[in-house]
Amino acid sequence: MKELEYPFDAAYIIKKRKSLKKALLADGTSRIRKKIAVFGGSTTSDIVKTLELFLLDAGIEPEFYESEYAQYFQDAMFPDETLLSFKPDIVFIHTTNRNVTDWPEMTDTTEQIDEKLHTEINRFTAMWKSIAEKFHCPIIQNNFEMPLYRLLGSRDAWDIHGRTNFLTRLNEAFYAYARENESFYIHDLNFVSADYGLKEWSNPLFWNMYKYAMCFEAIPSFAFSVSHIIKSIFGKNKKALALDLDNTLWGGVVGDDGVDGIEIGQETGVSQSYYEFQTYVKQLKSLGIVLTICSKNDHENAIAGLNHPEGALRPDDFVIIKANWENKDRNIAETAAELNILPDSIVFADDNPAEREIVRTQIKGAAVPDMDGVENYITTIDRSGFFEVTTFSEDDLKRNEMYKKNALRAAEMASFGDYNDYLKSLEMHAVIDDFIPVYLARITQLTNKSNQFNVTTRRYTPAEMESVFEDDGYIRLYGKLIDKFGDNGVVSVVIGRKNGTALDIDLWLMSCRVLKRDMEFAMLDRLVERCREVGVETINGYYYPTAKNKMVSDLFDRFGFTKTEENEDGSTVWQLRVADYKPQNHVIEVFGNDHAEA
């Protein structure tokens, strides 16, 4: 929704909250439903109402539990039956520096200040552990914003008696906990408040009158920031950035001005701004964001511009370069198809408002930020939260290279008349075996990112995946596919729950970058083999339809399962007798965990 895109009108959002919600719920978007518990150290009602808008816009339909005013500690430590039965999917602890209970005094000794610090840390740590034990769900915790005033002036930052120093030390303790606990996430309230303007943010009037820990007008900025973490946890991040060239990655028009005439580099303020934006884009690539070009240009001119000696980006930084004179909405759609991702996974960055509007109206779900002035490009993409990082794996570092190799595979496929011959030519081998610790982060990440080849679309938090990993009641398989072009990484996951002599499939997913490679048959062969080893006689498969997973509606039929149930909502149940199964993979050589690093 345009009204909820950065930069938004906070006053408008607050005023039109009800009508915006009504419009979002009526837009026909398929959303995942999530329960969110908000434990507040201050008034949270308007925060929750505004957060709901941003989550609906991100494809999440939230149901909220709100603690009573300042009852965050009690709810965390001693939840009542209402909260226990609510069973949140995520807990957000909204505390601020207003909730620090014992500040340093100028007369305190170092030991006394350290004791106060540890008391605060222990209070929060006890809450976090209690929530983890009782609810087994992700926790989002604000860090602390800096104080509105500094009693010691600049000395407040480094003197242990200063509140600024005390809050900084508390924040460092929070960060240390986050580094050691995978399902624990810090919401950077300190940054958001500073970005907004601490003087306005911390206006005492709103605390004294309404017990708000921020000014009323800051609530949309705060809720927007929180929504980024929630949508990232639940797999709603964007995956690719499609960029225009002229006046987006450099100043000027390369076809008219020539390579020597475009503005990029260190010579002028404008050229520096474009260089900084290119540098930022290259940093996004290092996070696993797929970079593509979508520009109305001659291909040769585009390549020449990207090879400018003062630029930070080069042609090989991009997986796909569409520099032609086709409509950009068509190029975006083709880019999505070639990457095997949905169009709503793409962010399109273009300085031209007319081109932006065409893509915005023609490509449903694609993010199209208003790129207003090169000096604002980085801020616009950064603050929009398209690529909020909550997990990071080795595969993220290699993602652009993996997609490039897929392009090489596609080119080779075109030279074969028989598809099976093409598959054999890839010289594929796979590691398919029980989960091992080194891949748990990637496996968890896949469950929250894979939407198309995913029969149940069940999501797992790191804590939930750890529980599955340790439970002998499951059969677990991950699949890692390698071919002559390179390593695709972990691309498939199957989780089945043993139920007597039956196995119920809780999860079956595969990355779209290895579609049509017969990897699913290799996974099935290994699953049946494992079932035979442990005495499982039947495998029950389940398909739950979503707006994005139609491609696997007939997966179990293709596997040779028999349909046993079909419901009005389109969900189906399937069954396979293990004794009747014959192997179906004939093109991938399969190994176990002893070849995991192959």
Positions of PLM-derived features:
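Short hydrophobic/aromatic-enriched beta-strand-loop microsegments
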Residues: E61-F64, P315-V319, A366-G373
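Terminal substrate-recognition subdomain of acyl/acetyltransferases
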Residues: R360, K364-L426, E529-A598
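Extracellular glycan-modifying ectodomains
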Residues: M1-A242, L249-W250, G255-G261, A354, ...
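Conserved Lys-Pro-Asp/Glu-containing loop-to-beta segment of HAD-superfamily phosphomonoesterases
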Residues: I332-P353, V359
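A conserved beta-strand-loop-helix scaffold within acyl/acetyltransferase catalytic domains
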Residues: V431-R513
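Basic, amphipathic juxtamembrane/active-site segments
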Residues: V254-T279, K364-M371
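Acyl-donor binding region in acyl/amide transferases
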Residues: K484, V490-N567
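Substrate-recognition element of Asp-dependent hydrolases with the DxDx(T/V) motif
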Residues: E276-N307, I321-K322, V359, Y439, ...
